[in-house]
């Protein structure tokens, strides 16, 4: 009797085929773009699936021991779009069930309602999984597509992804074809073309090359008009820039101009040594004015030596600088000998690891606000304030030195500047954390006017060891060169 029942069931279901009509890949280039004369940004996006229609024999599924099956669809995507792409999945309409093509038959294969493993799918339901995810998700409707993948950069090579359709069936289904259509949409992410500056050392080399024995640069700023051919402008954009950036010198007003079609210029990740005048002091040492207001520094990681040796600049406005990604500020302002005003109170230094020589040899600076400095990741503070002879006080109350390994010559003064020394007080909130401090040679060399909060000092300050990096408390046998901030 059981065999006869099985034969009847087999005949009834032999014509049940489940059709999955996979919709055409929707390939859309969705990025903003304005025409320019340099290099039109052309993003490409290709996407394909290995089949347009997935057919599954329902009889085989029902007669299997698990009454389940999986069907894999391979999705291939590649894009040159710099912000990547987004792939979504949905049905063509808000109907998520597989419906019998005979409208008189009302049985259907419904979407699962919650995440489930294949073996735990309810009878006569289906779902999908993506790539390595073992569990199956409810089939998404047109009004609420599922986000399969979202990338943020261009493809290095063709990407391969797998969409699996999982079903669980039983004999209660009526014979016939059950269908639905899935839409896989692959869309490039929005992208706005950008002007990106060349690397700092290359910019510096090109800026220096503008000068001659008679024509010197005294100003640097953006031009509102493009250069003419007679100006012999040179290109200073990065190879990944979507716009051309031109640089030239106008000898009449002694100004180095740059021009770009966009309002903003993104500085290179490596913006080190951009305005370095050179250790020989022969190039771009006469600059008196820098207009950096159109520079976006949000992607910069290296500002080491960025303004080093700019000996004639007296003020520097960096209020527009975003330093949230910067790790290297070593020697950033070193040897700016005539600088009298430096406002870096807006700096975010939370990622900085190197501040060595950052303010070294700024002889004429009388005040330095470091109240917002976050030094929690800094490892090298050597020579950080060396030869700053005109500071009378230094407020380091916000300093965290727990990771610092080197403070060699951190506050030192050269023998030649000893008579000009004015530093008397260093304010802190707590003793310096010297747990990881290894290099500390000559930290306070020649700082003979410096006193701790209770008057402690050494006849030869260069002999101070790391125990002097604390709040002065001689009454308890703890002399130090620091004063507790009021």
Language-model features: locations:
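Short, surface-exposed loop and linker segments with low hydrophobicity and enrichment for Pro/Ser/Thr
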Residues: 17, 73-84, 155-158, 244-254, ...
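Sec-dependent N-terminal signal peptides
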Residues: 11-27
């Amino acid at each position: 009797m059981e065999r006869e029942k099985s034969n009847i069931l087999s005949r009834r279901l032999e014509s049940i085929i489940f059709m999955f009509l996979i919709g055409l890949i929707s390939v859309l280039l969705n990025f903003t773009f304005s025409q320019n004369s340099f290099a039109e940004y052309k993003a490409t996006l290709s996407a394909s699936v290995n089949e347009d229609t997935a057919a599954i024999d329902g009889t085989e599924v029902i007669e299997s021991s698990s009454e389940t099956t999986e069907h894999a669809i391979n999705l291939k995507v590649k894009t040159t779009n710099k912000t990547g792409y987004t792939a979504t999945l949905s049905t063509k309409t808000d109907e998520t069930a597989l419906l019998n093509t005979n409208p008189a038959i009302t049985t259907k294969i419904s979407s699962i309602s919650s995440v489930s493993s294949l073996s735990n799918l309810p009878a006569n339901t289906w779902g999908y999984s993506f790539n390595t995810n073992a569990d199956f998700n409810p089939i998404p409707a047109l009004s609420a597509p599922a986000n399969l993948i979202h990338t943020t950069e261009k493809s290095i090579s063709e990407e391969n992804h797998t969409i699996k359709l999982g079903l669980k069936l039983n004999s209660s289904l009526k014979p016939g074809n059950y269908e639905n259509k899935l839409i896989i949409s692959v869309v490039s992410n929005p992208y706005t073309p950008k002007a990106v500056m060349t690397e700092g050392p290359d910019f510096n080399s090109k800026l220096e090359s503008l000068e001659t024995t008679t024509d010197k640069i005294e100003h640097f700023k953006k031009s509102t008009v493009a250069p003419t051919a007679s100006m012999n402008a040179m290109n200073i954009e990065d190879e990944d820039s979507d716009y051309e950036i031109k640089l030239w010198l106008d000898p009449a007003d002694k100004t180095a101009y740059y021009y770009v079609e966009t309002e903003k210029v993104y500085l290179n990740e490596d913006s080190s040594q951009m305005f370095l005048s050179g250790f020989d002091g022969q190039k771009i040492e006469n600059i008196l004015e820098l207009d950096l207001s159109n520079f976006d520094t949000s992607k910069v990681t290296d500002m080491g030596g960025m303004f080093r040796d700019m000996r004639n600049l007296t003020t520097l406005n960096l209020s527009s600088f975003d330093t949230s990604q910067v790790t290297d500020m070593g020697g950033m302002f070193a040897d700016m000998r005539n600088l009298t005003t430096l406002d870096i109170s807006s700096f975010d230094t939370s990622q900085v690891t190197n501040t060595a020589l950052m303010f070294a040899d700024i002889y004429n600076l009388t005040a330095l606000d470091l109240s917002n400095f976050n030094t929690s990741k800094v490892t090298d503070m050597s020579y950080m304030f060396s030869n700053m002879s005109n500071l009378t006080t230094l407020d380091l109350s916000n300093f965290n030195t727990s990771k610092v390994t080197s403070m060699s010559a951190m506050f030192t003064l050269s023998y030649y500047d000893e008579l000009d020394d004015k530093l008397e007080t260093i304010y802190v909130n707590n003793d310096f954390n010297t747990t990881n401090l290894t290099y500390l040679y000559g930290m306070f060399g020649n700082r003979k006017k410096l006193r701790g909060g209770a008057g402690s000092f050494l006849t030869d300050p260069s002999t101070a060891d790391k125990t002097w990096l604390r709040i002065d408390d001689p009454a308890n046998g703890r002399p130090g060169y620091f004063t507790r901030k009021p």
